[in-house]
Swiss-Prot record:
Disulfide bonds: none annotated. The lineage of its organism: Viruses, Varidnaviria, Bamfordvirae, Nucleocytoviricota, Megaviricetes. Keywords: DNA recombination, DNA-binding, Metal-binding, Transposition, Zinc. It comes from Acanthamoeba polyphaga mimivirus (APMV). Residues 21-47 have a biased composition (Basic residues). This is TnpB-like protein L79.
Amino acid sequence: MKEAVKNVKPKVPAKKRIITGSKTKKKVFVKKKPPDKKPLKKPVKKTVKTDKPKSIYVPNKDLKISKWIPTPKKEFTEIETNSWYEHRKFENPNKSPVQTYNKIVPVVPPESIKQQNLANKRKKTNRPIVFISSEKIRIYPTKDQQKILQTWFRLFAYMYNCTIDYINSKKVVLESGRINVAATRKVCNKISVRKAQKTIRDNLIQSTNPSIMTHIIDEAIGLACSNYKTCLTNYIERHIKKFDIKPWNMSKRKKIIIIEANFFKKGTFCPTVFPKMESSKPLTMIDKTVTLQYDSDTRKYILFVPRVTPKYSVNKEKNSCGIDPGLRDFLTVYSENETQSICPIEIVVNTTKNEYKKIDKINEIIKTKPNLNSKRKKKLNRGLRKYHRRVTNKMKDMHYKVSHELVNTFDKICIGKLNVKSILSKANTVLKSALKRKLATLSFYRFTQRLTHMGYKYGTEVVNVNEYLTTKTCSNCGKIKDLGASKIYECESCGMYADRDENAAKNILKVGLKPWYKQK
């Protein structure tokens, strides 16, 4: 037995043998040497290239600008504004004569040119490109007419929400973030969406008495499709991080309906339903689609009618200016013949003092008393909106009057870009909440929008200029100096003694007049 046991070969595990026919070969495992431990490399900081130059200075001779800049101690002459704000001016004693030239206005903005060209391609027409501006016409419906209009507003919003729910169900944008191209073709086509929503549309028309016009419901479907398109293009071009289009809130403050031009007849719209309609202006010569808006706070019905402004020639002066927006003065304007200071911040605080006191009181009541009735909450929120609206109306009045004054006196305006978003952010702890509120009330971004629109209307070029190094640079010699909180710029090299904001406005003008400067 012992000999038999000796002759038995031990079993080899399957992992350690390779079968090749009848023979077996043992697999040899060789231990590899561990790799030499190399010292870890420190992460190299990537240097981000910036386009910002080290200096923005350009000599006055190269741009053909005079060295004149007034001293801080000067007497301003007041300009009549017919409003609550102050507008002061100081003229150059050695004023040079200004040349005049003829210019055809209004100038059509490039965005509207693109839209009109696309419309001509789609409709296969050769309509001339025109300058379009909206006209406000207020209407005064009776109580019975108001009831009909309110049902129409509700049905328009309901149809809009139904179409957006239908489009979202097609899953155009997937969870991964990619876009389903096949689904976009179906969704972006208004006719295919109308066919899919036909049953809902017919039920809505039959439910109303008097019945709503089918074209008004179709406009709601078209508006939903166009809004979805714009949101999709913004997502593709990375203007927005997340694709999200939400339905309308049925109890929102502002409600709209879109009415076609064919419905405006006999001084009214939809004459079978509204045979007579009182309005602030006659409802005639309407050849484009109109939007009717209702504001629940003001309880006003307003028609926004697009109008074509005809072209005409105007005598313009060859006079350019630089504008520095700031916190001491709303605007500081510099040109070769004069300097202007528009609306000191103290006047803004005094005019909006009562409104903000009431706003703070209402906010305290809402915070300290959370268990309020729904009616009480609605009243308080309505009061908040009322006082905020008063402040915005005051700013709106100032914006339009100031922009009209500037556009009529200058043919080129270079305005500094003020990044208000970063200033008002919570991360910025340098500025106090009171200063942030002042900046928010002045709303510089809205002013630049209104100024550019008025510039196109009256033939004035508006250039947005980056404010980098405009306050620190001497406009006469180009030396850079850190001012801190001082209001006066005193140059040590050339001896220039001027106001801080006026020096910045002159630098903004010089940067905007550079022939190689491009808007960013």
